[in-house]
């Protein structure tokens, strides 16, 4: 609430770095889990988080790829006492195959499993997060956490090989996925072997072009009026396909696509075979 434009002007802040407290938004995932479970869930909420809590409490062997990334960020982790305490072992990153435990996370998940939304947004956990962020210079307040809400949106759809594909609306990358699928169908990508050079090349080019559109045109629907049908039209998809050269790599002339170091993956499981209960998961 306090992070308005005037604050950044007064403090001459022109860029917000990835490690800046000003880049930290109010976490929405926990609220979304609880809201979806309340609306659609059939199993006990404690069971939903039980697996994650067990992995955090009992530990798991570090994957080779994660060990490499961990090592690359070792210096960054040493700069903050909390990250140093939680993610370093005797001041070193965890190695491939080494068991990593995160007891504080396990304890937090247990509180959430018992108290749900209040356990994360109106609790000692909230106070601790706000205190930590404020100490780093953040403007976050407990009220910001209390006011967090989950929005339920209608899906956006498009056809693909006689199937109806549903995706989340903007500003998620759902529209990008639908555009990619439309391009693969337009280019008849299935005629190429899955492991062929042609298939890999087309998939890479399609991804680059669609994400370029996302980065240069799409935005928050509250501030950017986008007509989804325009970007899924036959004419527009054809124009995107025309940018692809089967013998050359596509290079953006507008701007480079910025890297995003984090992402979220969410999976919902269906626990019933009764078609009438398909809405319950």
Task: Label each region the model flagged.
Residues 1-122, 126-172, 232, 236-246:
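Noncatalytic scaffold domains of N-terminal-nucleophile
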Residues 52, 109, 180, 206-210:
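Short alpha-helical scaffolding segments that buttress acidic/His motifs in well-ordered protein cores
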Residues 123, 180, 263:
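Extreme N-terminus nucleophile/cap motif
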Residues 153-155, 177, 261-266:
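Short glycine-rich loop/turn motifs
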Residues 174-190:
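M16/insulysin-pitrilysin zinc metalloprotease superfamily fold
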Residues 189-270:
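Internal maturation/activation junctions in enzymes
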Residues 271-278:
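Conserved small/polar residues in nucleotide/adenosyl-binding loops
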Residues 281:
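Cationic, low-complexity basic patches in intrinsically disordered or flexible, solvent-exposed regions
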């Amino acid at each position: 609430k306090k992070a308005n434009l005037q604050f950044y002007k007064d403090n001459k802040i022109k860029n917000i770095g990835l490690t800046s407290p000003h880049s930290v938004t109010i976490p929405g995932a926990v609220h979304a889990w609880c809201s979806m479970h309340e609306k659609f869930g059939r199993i006990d909420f404690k069971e939903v988080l039980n697996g994650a809590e067990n992995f955090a409490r009992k530990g798991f062997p570090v994957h080779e790829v994660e060990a490499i990334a961990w090592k690359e960020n070792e210096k960054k982790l040493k700069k903050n006492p909390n990250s140093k305490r939680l993610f370093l072992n005797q001041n070193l990153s965890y190695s491939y195959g080494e068991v990593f435990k995160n007891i504080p996370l396990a304890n937090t998940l247990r509180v959430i499993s018992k108290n749900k939304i209040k356990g994360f947004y109106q609790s000692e956990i909230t106070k601790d997060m706000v205190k930590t962020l404020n100490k780093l210079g953040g403007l976050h307040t407990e009220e910001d956490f209390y006011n967090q809400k989950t929005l339920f949106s209608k899906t956006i759809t498009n056809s693909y090989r006689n199937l109806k594909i549903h995706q989340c609306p903007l500003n998620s990358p759902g529209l990008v996925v639908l555009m990619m699928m439309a391009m693969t169908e337009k280019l008849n990508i299935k005629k190429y072997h899955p492991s062929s050079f042609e298939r890999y090349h087309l998939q890479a080019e399609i991804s680059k072009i669609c994400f370029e559109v996302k980065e240069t045109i799409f935005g928050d629907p509250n501030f950017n009026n986008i007509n989804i049908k325009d970007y899924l039209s036959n004419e527009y998809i054809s124009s995107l396909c025309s940018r692809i050269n089967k013998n050359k790599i596509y290079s953006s002339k507008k701007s480079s696509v910025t890297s995003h170091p984090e992402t979220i993956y969410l999976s919902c499981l269906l626990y019933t075979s009764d078609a009438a209960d398909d809405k319950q998961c």
